Swiss-Prot record:
Biological process annotations from GO: ribosome disassembly
Encoding gene, per UniProt annotation: fusA
Compartment annotation: Cytoplasm
Protein name per its UniProtKB record: Elongation factor G
Keyword Transferase recorded: no
GO molecular function, one term: GTPase activity
Keywords: Cytoplasm, Elongation factor, GTP-binding, Nucleotide-binding, Protein biosynthesis
Domain tr-type G per the UniProt entry, residue ranges: 8-282
UniProt keyword Protein biosynthesis present: yes
Positions with a binding annotation for GTP: 17-24, 81-85, 135-138
Similarity comment text for this entry: Belongs to the TRAFAC class translation factor GTPase superfamily. Classic translation factor GTPase family. EF-G/EF-2 subfamily.
High-level lineage: Bacteria, Bacillati, Bacillota, Bacilli, Lactobacillales
Biological source species: Streptococcus pyogenes serotype M49 (strain NZ131)
One family name in Pfam for this protein: EFG_IV
Length: 692
């Protein structure tokens, strides 16, 4: 089957926002107006099309990024609905990795909120062009210009309105288009009848001022427009649209639109803006990768003529078809039934069926083309972030960075039958979600699961019970501490056993130095003259990695340490891999005596919103929890406090804040970085882990 939509008429977009900004409702309306659904489902009634997991419909939040395909104005729009809750950051990250553009949805009463900042930062890292939709203009307290101001103040974004609202709250009845300089008035509840009129007299002056500011802001991003503007020549609508498109695609400018998805206003105009201003796969730089055979950098331009290259960005288990692998095609064409090379794993995979997804319903297709997003059935070894390419033109595309989990809890099956099912369930859930880790404590046999936050683990335990019918007892959440060295040292590890049977002999000298935060463990072989034979070097590295899994102070994993093996000796007969592994672990223990080992704890960026009268209480809460205030700002009658607080001190804080503010205070937290725990706390942690 020939390609239905050209690359120029394809848009791959994400919808991203803070939790509760109305993102899923916005996506629902897009599906409604593009003819994908015939009845609108409200999130707060638990009937949304995109939120298809039971937990999502119950909680009214989006957990997994559902992918769907819609058509608008002769274009194909592939939409990924991403979660707004911070515990599901990986879902946002992996969608951004495969998108070409995004719509950031704001609650126009609150403007930029904490999770908006997180997803905005991630989108900036991936260089994703964005338009902004200030939603909920019908809500009490809605303030469009305040929302625009928060984009400047909190995100330092060069964002400018290309629309203005007519009225607000209950009186929100239409939108002024600052490019056409016309008013769009809504005359029915479904938002399908729109009258285009002249701008009402009382809004004309504000509209003219805003248009002038818009032209100036766009002209600043383009030399030719700037010359015309400075010489007083008129900039035509076509030139303005082209200028906005170019600046938006270059991530130099962010158009801001307004509306109310719930009240069916502004969504079609936002779809027009997606087509007008967000890039097609042809507008963005060709994806780069590395040839696994030559290590040379290669590009894959968006074209059906190029060799096939795609990135797997999500794994899901579907009750009807089994394991689904979502992938984005960057170049080339793929037919169902063909073979591809998973270059990340070095394995050949067969594509069974190819499905085009619409939330949780699906349509089988024969072929996918460059720029498409689809799901494949039948891939056995592919996981999130793997590259799938033509067997004759291999390339490894840049993968998806996975954040480390910060919170863990113990799960215990209720019966022997549950134990077997639990192993399978946890393995499948971990395949779907790379931020979810499962470990078994070797000494106690307990199963420990780790994730990005309490809600994250709640949802996964819930899925284990519902989807896999596993009954389990769940322990209290615990912090995922880490350990590291704060000083450099040299240490010897010497292991010798020569009594009875085959002897063992391993002798190493290793220099340990602190590594940069986030760099993890790095091993360097600096052996000269074969004092440690080459075949035993991997055993030394393996011995260190295994020992570092249970750190020297309290048994927490060690991170950010460099180890340089620079000397040692061996025995012709008695030396073995095992002996050198043990010698390496002894060197690590020895190093701990002088390398200033430290325990690290996850620090959360906490944003607390509370009535002004309770500001003193909130500041007290932060200080009492070993936190430090990073900034404050007033918003109406509330104060917003941003602070860094250890995760260990945040358990149960929701209850404390609720009672201090009579239920009017709220907080959000997102993992920010790891930091040394104070000495007194370190001693307590060590005592606790040793059961003293």
């Amino acid at each position: 089957m020939a390609r239905e939509f050209s690359l120029a008429k394809t848009r791959n977009i994400g919808i991203m926002a803070h939790v509760d900004a109305g993102k899923t409702t916005t996506t629902e309306r897009i599906l409604y107006y593009t003819g994908k659904i015939h009845k609108i489902g409200e999130t707060h009634e638990g009937a949304s099309q995109m939120d298809w997991m039971e937990q999502e419909q119950e909680r009214g939040i989006t957990i997994t990024s559902a992918a769907t395909t819609a058509q608008w104005d002769g274009h194909r729009v592939n939409i990924i609905d991403t979660p707004g809750h911070v515990d599901f950051t990986i879902e946002v990250q992996r969608s951004l990795r495969v998108l070409d553009g995004a719509v950031t949805v704001l609650d126009s009463q609150s403007g930029v909120e904490p999770q908006t900042e997180t997803v905005w930062r991630q989108a900036t890292e991936y260089g994703v062009p964005r338009i902004v939709f200030a939603n909920k203009m019908d809500k009490i307290g809605a303030d469009f210009l305040y929302s625009v101001q928060t984009l400047h103040d909190r995100l330092q974004a060069n964002a400018h309105p290309i629309q203005l609202p007519i009225g607000a709250e209950d009186d929100f009845r239409g939108i002024i288009d600052l490019i056409k300089m016309k008013a769009e008035i809504y005359t029915n509840d479904l938002g399908t009848d729109i009258l285009e009129e002249d701008i009402p007299e009382e809004y004309l002056e504000q509209a003219q001022e805003s248009r002038e500011k818009l032209i100036e802001a766009v002209a600043e991003t383009d030399e030719d427009l700037m010359m015309k503007y400075l010489e007083g020549e008129e900039i035509t609508n076509d030139e303005l649209i082209a200028g906005i498109r170019k600046a938006t695609i270059n991530v130099e400018f962010f158009p801001v639109l307004c509306g109310s998805a719930f009240k069916n206003k502004g969504v079609q105009l936002m779809l027009d803006a997606v087509i007008a201003y967000l890039p097609s796969p042809l507008d963005i730089p060709a994806i780069k990768g590395v040839n696994p055979d030559t290590d040379a950098e290669e590009e894959r331009p968006a074209s059906d003529e190029e060799p096939f290259a795609a990135l797997a960005f999500k794994i899901m288990t579907d009750p009807f078809v089994g394991r689904l692998t979502f992938f984005r095609v960057y170049s080339g064409v793929l037919n169902s039934g063909s073979y591809v090379m998973n270059t990340s794993k070095g394995k050949r995979e067969r594509i069974g069926r190819i499905l085009q997804m619409h939330a949780n319903s699906r349509q089988e297709i024969e072929t996918v083309y460059a720029g498409d997003i689809a799901a494949a059935v039948g891939l056995k070894d592919t996981t999130t972030g793997d590259s799938l390419t033509d067997e004759k033109a291999k390339v490894i595309l840049e993968s998806i960075e996975v954040p480390e989990p910060v919170i863990q809890l113990m799960v215990e099956p209720k019966s022997k039958a549950d134990q077997d099912k639990m192993g399978v369930a946890l393995q499948k859930l971990a395949e779907e979600d790379p931020t979810f880790r499962v470990e078994t404590n070797v000494e106690t046999g307990e199963t420990v699961i780790a994730g990005m936050g309490e809600l994250h683990l709640d949802v996964l335990v819930d899925r284990m019970k519902r989807e896999f019918k596993v009954e389990a007892n769940v322990g209290a959440p615990q912090v995922s501490y880490r350990e590291t060295f704060r000083a450099s040292t040299q240490a010897r590890g010497f292991f010798k056993r020569q009594s009875g049977g085959k002897g063992q002999f391993g002798d190493v000298w290793i220099e340990f130095t602190p590594n940069e935060e986030g760099k993890g463990f790095e091993f360097e072989n600096a052996i000269v003259g074969g004092v440690v034979p080459r075949e035993f070097i991997p055993a030394v590295e393996k011995g260190l990695i295994e020992s570092m899994a249970n750190g020297v102070l309290a048994g927490y994993p060690m991170v950010d340490v460099k180890a340089k093996l620079y000397d040692g000796s061996y025995h012709d007969v008695d030396s073995s891999e095992t002996a050198f592994k043990i010698a390496a672990s002894l060197a690590l223990k020895e190093a701990a005596k002088s390398a200033q080992p430290a325990i690290l704890e996850p620090m959360m960026l906490v944003t607390i919103t509370a009535p002004e009268d309770n500001l003193g209480d909130v500041m007290g809460h932060v200080t009492a929890r070993r936190g430090r205030v990073d900034g404050m700002e007033a918003h109406g009658n509330s104060q917003i406090v941003r602070a860094y607080v250890p995760l260990a001190e945040m358990f149960g804080y929701a209850t404390v804040l609720r009672s201090a503010t009579q239920g009017r205070g709220t907080f959000m937290m997102v993992f920010d970085h790891y930091e040394d725990v104070p000495k007194s706390v370190q001693e307590e942690i060590i005592k606790k882990t040793k059961g003293e």
